[in-house]
């Protein structure tokens, strides 16, 4: 009979160890178990490629997404002419007339209601998404999960189809003392000799069919994390590495701090620093030059650090 309490304790311990990691819905914005996100900028994509905004950025106002018109028009092949408050856009067989401050526009003589007035901010004209869809005749979709405005095709390209491989030698010094991190298992496991050098503006892209949409900073109880928005449904998630010229490369497996899903999206968290961890507590994300994806791919994927 004396052995029974010990047996029960062992069975309880085994049961706890076998419990699955909790999976949370990304819709639970106030759930304290989910790391808190820092501000996520809105991105606009035309045919799954980002539109670059050099000064004024897209914004959310009164539950409507507003975008700077000229850069979107240019990306769509439109010719924009501004005279005072009057804007004319010629795109293919479509001529659009818009007056700053008005809630309507004209497309080939047809009146279109915009829902929100066009506005001028620091020399840029902002329009609601309805203008892009109805006045310019484009398919437009707002994705509140990724904070992406999709215009046109949503077909995300494979990374190897948009970037060329480069020699990895100029980047080998980042792995000094951690050479094992250079190993990739693509057509056999061996040190990488090539690399894809990626700008953050190259996202989204696919790696072996899995999409990477964006990287963002998050925190939970003093822990600093990177959140990757992907379709990577692997239980462990693909590992990352932080490459810093002044310290050893740091491998970051996907953390079990939370498993967060929203439809086809998977959110993987990577621990940058922890206040109780001697090795990482003083590490700041801006120290890294690159965030490296350790995927089994023709070359190492080196993303220029978007956080420094």
PLM region spans:
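Primary recognition of N-terminal secretory signal peptides and signal-anchoring hydrophobic helices
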Residues: 4-7, 22-223, 266-308
């Amino acid at each position: 009979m004396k052995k029974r309490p010990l047996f029960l304790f062992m069975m309880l311990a085994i049961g706890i160890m076998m419990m699955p990691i909790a999976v949370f819905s990304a819709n639970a914005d106030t759930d304290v178990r989910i790391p808190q996100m820092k501000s996520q900028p809105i991105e606009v994509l035309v045919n799954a490629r980002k539109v670059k905004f050099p000064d004024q950025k897209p914004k959310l106002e009164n539950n409507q997404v507003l975008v700077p018109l000229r850069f979107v028009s240019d990306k769509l092949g439109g010719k924009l002419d501004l005279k005072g408050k009057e804007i004319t856009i010629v795109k293919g067989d479509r001529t659009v007339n818009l007056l700053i401050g008005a809630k309507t526009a004209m497309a080939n003589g047809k009146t279109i209601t915009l829902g929100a007035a066009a506005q001028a901010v620091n020399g840029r004209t902002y329009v609601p998404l309805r203008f892009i869809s109805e006045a310019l005749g484009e398919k437009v979709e707002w994705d509140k999960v990724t904070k992406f405005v999709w215009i046109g095709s949503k077909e995300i390209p494979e990374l190897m189809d948009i970037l060329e491989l480069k020699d990895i030698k100029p980047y080998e010094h980042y792995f000094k003392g951690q050479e094992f991190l250079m190993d990739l298992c693509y057509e056999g496991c061996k040190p990488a000799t090539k690399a894809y050098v990626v700008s953050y503006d190259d996202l989204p892209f696919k790696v072996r069919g899995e999409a990477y949409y964006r990287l963002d900073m998050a925190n939970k109880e003093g822990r600093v994390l990177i959140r990757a928005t992907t379709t990577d449904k692997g239980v462990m998630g693909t590992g990352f590495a932080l490459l810093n010229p002044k310290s050893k490369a740091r491998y970051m497996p996907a953390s079990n701090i939370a498993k967060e899903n929203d439809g086809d999206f998977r959110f993987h968290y990577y621990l940058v620093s922890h206040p109780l961890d001697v090795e990482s507590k003083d590490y700041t994300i801006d120290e890294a030059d690159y965030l490296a994806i350790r995927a089994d791919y023709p070359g190492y994927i080196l993303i220029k650090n978007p956080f420094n």
